[in-house]
Amino acid sequence: MSISREDIEKVAVLARIKVDGEQVSALEKDLGNILDLVDQLSAADTDAVEPMAHPLDAVQKLRPDVVTETNQREAFQAIAPATEDGLYLVPRVIE
């Protein structure tokens, strides 16, 4: 598969990037090589390969779900301007 000079110029316009003649030639070559590699990958026979979600059979070890901090509600509410029944009171912003 190849990409034409016109395709590169069209994509450059759509992407709003400026490319000059030398860059278009280099991009044409580089993108052609990339598309050739994609064609090679597409041609590989993967019928006997079992699909997988991750290449490693490792399971992430999670920490236990336990409380690690003490309850400091009273200390925080002691320095708050206004509280009531354990809740913070704030000024009304919607009438």
UniProtKB/Swiss-Prot annotation:
GO-annotated biological processes: glutaminyl-tRNAGln biosynthesis via transamidation; regulation of translational fidelity; translation
Keywords noted in UniProt: ATP-binding, Ligase, Nucleotide-binding, Protein biosynthesis
Top class in the EC scheme: ligase
InterPro entries named among the record's database cross-references: Asp/Glu-ADT_sf_sub_c, GatC
Catalytic activity: L-glutamyl-tRNA(Gln) + L-glutamine + ATP + H2O = L-glutaminyl-tRNA(Gln) + L-glutamate + ADP + phosphate + H(+); L-aspartyl-tRNA(Asn) + L-glutamine + ATP + H2O = L-asparaginyl-tRNA(Asn) + L-glutamate + ADP + phosphate + 2 H(+)
Enzyme Commission (EC) number: 6.3.5.-
GO MF terms held by the record: asparaginyl-tRNA synthase (glutamine-hydrolyzing) activity; ATP binding; glutaminyl-tRNA synthase (glutamine-hydrolyzing) activity
Oligomer and partners: Heterotrimer of A, B and C subunits.
UniProt family annotation: Belongs to the GatC family.
Role noted for this protein: Allows the formation of correctly charged Asn-tRNA(Asn) or Gln-tRNA(Gln) through the transamidation of misacylated Asp-tRNA(Asn) or Glu-tRNA(Gln) in organisms which lack either or both of asparaginyl-tRNA or glutaminyl-tRNA synthetases. The reaction takes place in the presence of glutamine and ATP through an activated phospho-Asp-tRNA(Asn) or phospho-Glu-tRNA(Gln).
Protein name as catalogued: Aspartyl/glutamyl-tRNA(Asn/Gln) amidotransferase subunit C
Protein's organism: Marinobacter nauticus (strain ATCC 700491 / DSM 11845 / VT8) (Marinobacter aquaeolei)
Gene: gatC
